[in-house]
């Protein structure tokens, strides 16, 4: 399988694969690294259970398990690119040569944007809960009303419950002249 190389349209690209496999028989691997051999060697992508790219200021690229796409190709991007299978050590090597005609080099800093994070709360974890509450059309003061009802019912229950308890007799002190009984019912 030929790696996809996209660059300035006036640049001519010469590439070839150097290994024992045919280009059109490349199978899809998992746990793949794309490596650019230069000084220093640069691991561009790590693929497996995750997708990690190492951005650089002088090369724009995108990768997956089977292809490496280089954007705005310049002579700086020429060299050896390797697709390395981490599980068994198998490698596919690609050599890229860029031949410049009478053209200007492509502009750096024009990499395509893959992911754009949103600053709003539409994609956050609790956004569905917030939307459900907003759609319920419950007035804001309803919680205060329910709290007032609960407190009122509790006070009424306490008042009514206090009348059901049998009253204790009230005792008064008798005059001093009755020595036998000190307390009596009033």
From Swiss-Prot:
It is a single-pass membrane protein. Belongs to the RL11 family. Coiled coil: none annotated. Glycans are attached at residues 24, 64, 72. It comes from Human cytomegalovirus (strain AD169). It is found in: Virion membrane. This is Protein TRL14. The keyword Transmembrane helix applies. Its main location: virion. The keyword Transmembrane helix applies. Keywords: Glycoprotein, Membrane, Transmembrane, Transmembrane helix, Virion. The chain crosses the membrane at residues 143-163. One of its GO terms (cellular component) is membrane.
């Amino acid at each position: 399988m030929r790696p996809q190389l996209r660059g300035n349209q006036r640049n001519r690209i010469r590439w070839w694969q150097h290994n024992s496999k045919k280009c059109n028989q490349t199978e899809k691997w998992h746990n793949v690294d794309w490596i650019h051999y230069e000084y220093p060697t640069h691991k561009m992508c790590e693929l497996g259970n995750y997708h990690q790219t190492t951005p650089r200021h002088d090369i724009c690229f995108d990768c997956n398990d089977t292809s490496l796409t280089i954007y705005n190709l310049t002579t700086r991007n020429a060299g050896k690119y390797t697709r390395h299978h981490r599980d068994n050590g198998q490698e596919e090597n690609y050599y890229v040569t860029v031949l410049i005609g009478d053209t200007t080099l492509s502009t750096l800093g024009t990499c395509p944007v893959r992911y754009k994070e949103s600053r709003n709360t539409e994609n956050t974890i609790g956004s569905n809960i917030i939307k459900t509450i907003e759609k319920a059309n419950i007035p804001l003061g309803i919680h205060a009303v329910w709290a007032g009802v609960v407190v009122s019912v509790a006070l009424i229950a306490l008042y009514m419950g206090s009348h059901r308890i049998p009253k204790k007799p009230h005792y008064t002190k008798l005059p001093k002249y009755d020595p036998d009984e000190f307390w009596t019912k009033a």
